């Protein structure tokens, strides 16, 4: 029985054109690029997740109705945040000092649009952004 060498003979290597070597390098680099892209997407996803977790932690610290030593889910944090915002809005709407204040006087927009003399801006609040 004849022993077969696992290494290709030199004559066979000489027959393989140089293009195959370049193609192999190209395929390898394409594969490396694909792996690198995948890793970048994975890292971006992780960064986004860490950012979101950081935001939830910050909300948990800022909203006084969330117990500090109790573990709460993200949904519970959002529910507390919504309730807190609604409470703040209600407090602003019903605050006695704010209710007594007169709204600032300003020229109605209909007068500004119909009267050419009113195009001159007298006050900062009277300016119209789009003309």
From Swiss-Prot:
Gene Ontology terms describing biological process: negative regulation of transcription by RNA polymerase II
SMART domains, per database record: HLH
Any GO CC annotation of this UniProt entry: cytoplasm
SUPFAM superfamilies recorded: HLH, helix-loop-helix DNA-binding domain
Subcellular location: Nucleus
Chain ranges of the bHLH domain: 36-88
Keyword Nucleus recorded: yes
UniProt entry tagged with the keyword Protein biosynthesis: no
One example GO MF annotation: protein dimerization activity
Matches recorded under InterPro entries: bHLH_dom (IPR011598), DNA-bd_prot-inh (IPR026052), HLH_DNA-bd_sf (IPR036638)
PANTHER family listed in its UniProt record: DNA-BINDING PROTEIN INHIBITOR, DNA-BINDING PROTEIN INHIBITOR ID-4
Subunit structure of this chain's protein: Heterodimer with other HLH proteins.
Function: Transcriptional regulator (lacking a basic DNA binding domain) which negatively regulates the basic helix-loop-helix (bHLH) transcription factors by forming heterodimers and inhibiting their DNA binding and transcriptional activity. Inhibits the activity of both neurogenic (neurog1/neurogenin, neurod1/neuroD) and myogenic (myod1/myoD) bHLH factors.
The protein's name in its UniProt record: DNA-binding protein inhibitor ID-4
Species name: Xenopus tropicalis
Lineage of the species this protein comes from: Eukaryota, Metazoa, Chordata, Craniata, Vertebrata
